[in-house]
Amino acid sequence: MSLMKVLAIDLGASSGRVMQAVYNGSSLQLSEVHRFKNEPVNLNDGLYWNLLHLFGEIKQGIKKASNDSIPIRSISVDTWGVDYAYLDHNGDLLYQPHCYRDNRMGRYEESFYQLISKNELFKKTGVQPATYNTILQIYSDLQEKPQLKEVVQRVLFIPDLINYLLAGVLANEYTIASTSGLLDVFTQDFSEEIFEKLGIPTKWFSSPVKNGSVLRDLSPRIVQELKVEPFKVIAGAGHDTAAAVLAIPYENEKGTVFISCGTWSLVGIESDKPIITDEAFESGLTNEGCFDGKYRLLQNTTGMWIIQELQRDWRSQGEEVSFAEMVQLAEKVTDNQTWIYPNDPVFASPGDMESKIKEFCKVTGQAVPQTKGHIVRIVIESLALTYLETIEQLEDLTKQEMTTVQMVGGGIQNKLLCQITANFTNRLVITGPVEASALGNILSQLFTLEVIHSRQEAQNLIKASEVVTRYEPQAVEEFSNIQQKFKQIKKGISSC
């Protein structure tokens, strides 16, 4: 067959890329076309994403990708979850989208949960209640700006918004909508009952698009501006984790836990049915949507965010420390006896991450790290301990032994994290691909275009295109003591 090019806009919470994959009928050749920063902007009234900047960068990437003779067949977008934008009756953006790390939701949590309890919300939506969830964000917006009910015509999640800017079609895609806390977990459609209870207009959303959909060709205005040939804009796997899971080259899906490791780490399994038991709720697990309509039962845990913030801290102090250098420094620390709980709210907000880690260690009665290497080692080991905690919860809930961990995403470039995860979980860890979200985005387009037709075909394509690495577990001396101390640290902070 002739070569075919497919583009993926892959936006993370710290950077964005336009990627291209050239498909030759048996494998994919993935390459980065354009990379750019994505950082929220602090304004007087909150924290916002600079969507206009991002869209300008996306157009640059499309232009660069068109500079050879291989025709572009389609493009799709995947992003982080929960965030969204308001459009008015003219289809115009009302204001830049809020960032999920904005603090406005804290002012309205109490009144929100008086209307619907956390347990009821979980049972209806399958989504673990969290401050950053779309449902609480929108409720908070309506408390502060009740006039939104009069001026807003549609609400689009971030990938939906970019698709709209590219093609002019208003659509809500299923996988990204499944992160919102607004869908009925069984019907996989927006819950009228919840909307009515919270006073959210149902007209703001449309029934989610599932299993991929061709929206329209790239808008004539952009075609003319960029001087490119028209190609299809597809609503594929809009949520980056759903995309990443689609690209996992399972050796055996049964008995395998996935970890999608980026700014966040998503630790979970694929399931034919949602699990909304009290045990799942109390364990902090959530049910999100897969591209093929299945469910991702997972825990949203902190990922490389703390490492990224440490790097930002040190850069602001005039010290440029690369991620590779951070790992090298951490590898030299072999006698660590200090850990943090990465999911503690203190680590969720940006800034002063080194000070937060030291203060946490002090408050919990542990040795306070004095070197960069020790700080990074603490973070890496603590992430692996958090992964183990979730794996054991998944085993308890499903009554199924999890023998293998498949890690994907940018975080797997941290080989120390991968090996420590194997050691601490005492399980085989298989890593790859690094660019799982982009590849899953590509695969969702190939499904939509009917180029591929099954998950097995998709997995074979990834195996033919990407390299995977295996990490065998190595014994850790007195690991039961380490695990027990970590549990005590977590219990101690929860009782504070």
Task: Give short role names for the model-derived ranges.
Residues 1-95, 223-233, 425-427, 496:
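N-terminal glycine/serine-rich phosphate-binding loop of ATP-dependent small-molecule kinases
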Residues 7-8, 20, 113-125, 139-157, ...:
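Active-site core segments that coordinate phosphate-bearing ligands/cofactors
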Residues 35, 39, 98-105, 263-265, ...:
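Short, acidic/turn-prone active-site loops that include or flank metal/cofactor-
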Residues 71-79, 154, 207, 400-409:
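Short glycine-rich phosphate-binding loop at a beta-alpha junction
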Residues 168-176:
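Enzymes and membrane/adaptor proteins characterized by extended Gly/Ser/Thr/Asp/Glu-rich
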